[in-house]
Amino acid sequence: MIEIFQVKDRKTLKEFVRFPEVLYTNCPQYVPNLRMDEKAIFTTSPCLDYCKLKMWIVKDGKRVVGRIAAIINPRYNKLYNVKRVRFGWIDFEENIEIAKLLLDSAEQWAKEEGMTEIHGPLGYNTWYKQGMLVEGFENVPQVNCIYNYPYYKEFIEKLGFEKECDWVQYKLPPTQGVSDKLRRINDMLLARYPLRVVDLNVIKKQDDLIERFFDHYNETFKRVHNFVPLTKKEIDVLGKQYIKLLRPELNCFVMDDQGRIAAYGICFPSLSEAYQKAKGRLFPFGWWHILRAYTKYSGIDLMMVGADPAWQSKGVSAIFHCHLADNFKGKDLKYSITNPQIEDNSAVKVWDSYQEKEDYMRRRCYIKTIK
């Protein structure tokens, strides 16, 4: 008999965090999170300052067979004038009754809190993993992306959820270069306007530049579906750690003569295989696998691209595309994977300028009215 339990203590939190490792034991595509990072999400995240969080696990006897987290983000609801609860970190064995019990529990709590809709999978905000995998199950995801079995999609649609939006990802040969059109735009912009590429090491050493970048991030992404701007504390805790992990040769920040960030392209060494080898543990040897992949890499994750609205119409993104393409020349790089991008985001169209690209994964946010 299956029963649901709210996560309230260290024991149930441990079961919640470790359940996917059991569920995906024999899945070669699955990339486990580091346990310490996963626990921190639910205990010390700065998002908990304003978000409401509930978590559940489902057990069959003593065995965990499912999990889910439900989040109410009042900043999101106010920004979009809605009453929505987010569900995330949802995993379950191939039994629709488990999925139903998890989602019903999240819906019931949301109803008690006055919410009228439920959507997900989503995290506290855009900084966290989001989107249920609906295409590309044969591929290995990036470390910041969700992987799930194909039956998730089938079950959640049977339970009355519908598509809200999709994110798409592409696989590209990183050494293919850029189109002649992008190169011409790059040359024209650098000749006509006071734009320059800034050394990443300079940005890392100046907190004001990092804060300026995240102000720019909040501004450039505010038109993207479901985006929630980062707070000052989130920038201090999450953002600054992230920037300081970036490698100079894989990133490009473009600034104007006023010291404003005009555009950026952020990439990261692919760490998926290293995380698989670490098996959720940083010690005793997980750190070594991750450090080695960080310094000796053959794959790249194209994590984030953005352009200031004032420069976007001029095609400023061509500068970081050309800069990174030049950096990649001559390197022994086998592949690059784009980060999930909302399918109606105009930034997705830039990948059409690359002659060689293939569909890699598609993710979906589902939504349902709470009755």
Task: Tell where the protein language model's regions lie, with residue ranges.
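Acyltransferase donor/substrate-recognition loop-hinge adjacent to the catalytic core
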Residues: I146-N226
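Acyl-donor binding region in acyl/amide transferases
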Residues: L79-G160, A278-S353
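A conserved beta-strand-loop-helix scaffold within acyl/acetyltransferase catalytic domains
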Residues: P20-D60, I68-K78, L200-V305
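Extreme N-terminal starter segment of soluble prokaryotic enzymes
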Residues: M1-E3
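Active/binding-pocket-proximal capping segment
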Residues: T231-I235, Q258, I266-G286, F320-N327, ...
